[in-house]
Amino acid sequence: MSKGYAVITGASAGLGVCFANRLAKEGYPLVLVARRKERLEALRESLEKKYCVICKVIVSDISKEKDCKALIKELKELPLEILINNAGFGECGAFSETNIKNDLNMIDVNIKALHMLMKFALLKMKKKDKGYILNVASSAGLIPAGPFMSTYYATKSYVTSLTQAVSEELRQAKSHIYVGCLCPGPVDTEFNEVANVKFALKGISAEYCANYAIDQMFARKKVIVPELRMKMAVTFGRYLPLSFYIRIVAKQQKKKIGNKV
């Protein structure tokens, strides 16, 4: 039986490239979505040559609603089996000092575009009652609040909350559609440079994170946390008084940005 398309946003770098390689290896035809055309074309050429799979490229800035709608229009006629909502970014700094344009752009990418694509994919998948939707969140989405990276933490909390709610709705409907979220800690990608952070802990490789996530997705794990240390940290945090926990997070965030705030 032929496989449907796997759509990957944020496919031009980091986790997106690793997701694309893994799913191409599994034999899935791909739709690669990102802003950087040259990188997408280079990746397409590499994947087609290495894995002999169909690979479509769509250059899109999904922070813009019109681009997101245009992307959905292009995907409507394709047999969709997997959606990986991977596009996203973060920024550090005190809330009162970060640029409002960047804040809203982050909300548009991390929340609005993800929400639109997820709803489109789910409605399309419901026609055959099968498919996979993996939302890339962060361990930040499992933590109550993140001072000095407040907007980013809030967007990822939205992703984890939405994902778990929709997953439960599907379970109660006895649907075969999978909806889950990936919540990694530090990963070695260009995210760190864009967000202007330096993690105290060594990050895991993007390749390991992507492969682990795909394995867990096919195993139908709803909340995917790749590392034991992050699982333990999140679990331990639940037993702390909320205000104390948030102070600890604030202290760690200030270390990441070199106590610049």
Where are these regions (language model features)?
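Active-site helix of classical SDR
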Residues: 118, 155
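Substrate-binding pocket helix/loop in short-chain dehydrogenase/reductase
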Residues: 94-96, 102-107
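Conserved glycine-rich Rossmann-like NAD(P)H-binding loop of the short-chain dehydrogenase/reductase
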Residues: 26-42
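Conserved NAD(P)H cofactor-binding loop of Rossmann-fold oxidoreductase domains
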Residues: 86-91
